Design a protein with these regions (language model features):
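Helical scaffold of the NTase/Pol beta-like nucleotidyltransferase catalytic core
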Residues: 1-34
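Conserved NTP/Mg2+-binding pocket subregion across the NTase superfamily
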Residues: 2-10, 14, 66, 70-187, ...
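Catalytic metal-binding acidic patch
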Residues: 37, 41-71, 81-88
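Extended amphipathic alpha-helical interaction segments
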Residues: 169-175, 197-212
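P-loop NTPase catalytic cores that bind/hydrolyze ATP
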Residues: 180-200
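Short, charged amphipathic alpha-helical segments flanked by flexible coils
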Residues: 203-242
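Long, charge-rich low-complexity segments
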Residues: 232-280, 284
Length: 310
């Protein structure tokens, strides 16, 4: 069984076991196995997930096979202390995958095993991709503020905190011992980059699949006052500090400045988000209208008198 390695023994061991377990349980059914995300791009840090997509040949032979494929993915989580984000799909059902995942597999993945089918894969339509990018950006924003909905304009999560509440307890995976959690900035960096991706979707026709690609493309195509902020958030927050709080006082001051700027960036995004949702609400597409209505439930926009408006 020929499995491509990425040069990180602990991760390569996990990836090999994933492929072997899928081949053992579904002999002859696996078309390919792809690695996406930070490990595929080569800039993974301590807190990075392992992102894998297992592609079955043709269609799933039954609903049972599809369920077993997903169940196996969950069962493999204990192979690593890191968060294992594993999706299984079939060639016939690829168009039903989330748009961001389809774009990631086609454009920025690494083939670990099997036949390379990426040239035959289609990208999601721009409208679908934009809805997905918007939904993910809002999800991370809500996680960052630890709420189910927000009111525009936002306030800092903790105005009196050293980092305005943007530093939060983080663990390696959902199964990690909560006693091992320590404060970090993973959600902060993730949220900033996801917002950048959504703004790109609003303003351009470019698909991006990774944080680095999002930041670089934002600089290339939008290049506004937030381009340097996003670059610093990615390069310092992820690549330099590995989502951890820096210990050096000078670097902590640098992080505090980034955190201070995060709030106006979030509000900048929410203004663009509202304009996008209103456009969707006025379209003839029923799915777009429903998406907009749901989004307007999660973000409450008030007028100067404090009354709710769309």
């Amino acid at each position: 069984m020929q499995i491509r390695t990425i040069g990180k023994p602990s991760i390569d061991n996990v990836l090999s076991q994933i492929v072997e377990r899928y081949e053992a349980q579904f002999p002859g059914r696996i078309r390919a196995c792809y690695l996406t995300g930070s490990y595929a791009e080569g800039n993974a840090v301590e807190w990075s997930d392992i992102d894998v997509y297992v592609l079955f040949k043709d269609a799933f032979v039954s609903e049972g096979e599809a369920a077993q494929a997903e169940q196996l993915g969950r069962a493999l989580a204990p192979l690593t202390p890191l968060r294992l984000d594993l999706h299984a799909g079939s060639e016939q059902s690829q168009d039903s995958l989330p748009g961001f995942l389809r774009a990631a597999v086609k454009n920025t993945s690494v083939l670990l095993y099997g036949e390379d089918t990426r040239k035959h894969m289609s990208l999601p339509g721009l409208e679908e991709y934009t809805r997905d990018a918007t939904e993910i950006a809002l999800k991370f924003l809500l996680w960052l503020h630890q709420v189910e909905n927000v009111t525009y304009p936002l306030a800092y999560p903790d105005p009196d905190g050293a980092f305005f509440g943007y530093d939060q307890l983080q663990v390696l995976s959902d199964s990690s011992d909560r006693a091992e959690a320590r404060p970090g900035i993973r959600f902060l960096v993730e949220s900033a980059c996801r917002i950048g991706t959504a703004l790109l979707a609003f303003k351009t026709d470019r698909y991006v699949s990774t944080k680095r690609e999002s930041v670089q493309t934002y600089r290339e195509l939008i290049n506004d006052e937030w381009a340097s902020f996003l670059e610093a958030m990615f390069e310092r927050g992820k690549l330099c500090w590995s989502y951890n709080l820096p210990e050096n006082e000078e670097e902590r001051a640098e992080l505090r400045i980034l955190c201070e700027r995060m709030l106006p960036f979030e509000n900048h995004y929410l203004r663009a988000h509202r304009a996008y949702l209103l456009a969707q609400l006025g379209s003839n597409n029923e799915a777009a209208k429903q998406f907009a209505l749901q989004g307007l439930k999660q973000v409450i926009y008030l007028d100067e008198a404090g009354d709710k408006l769309y």
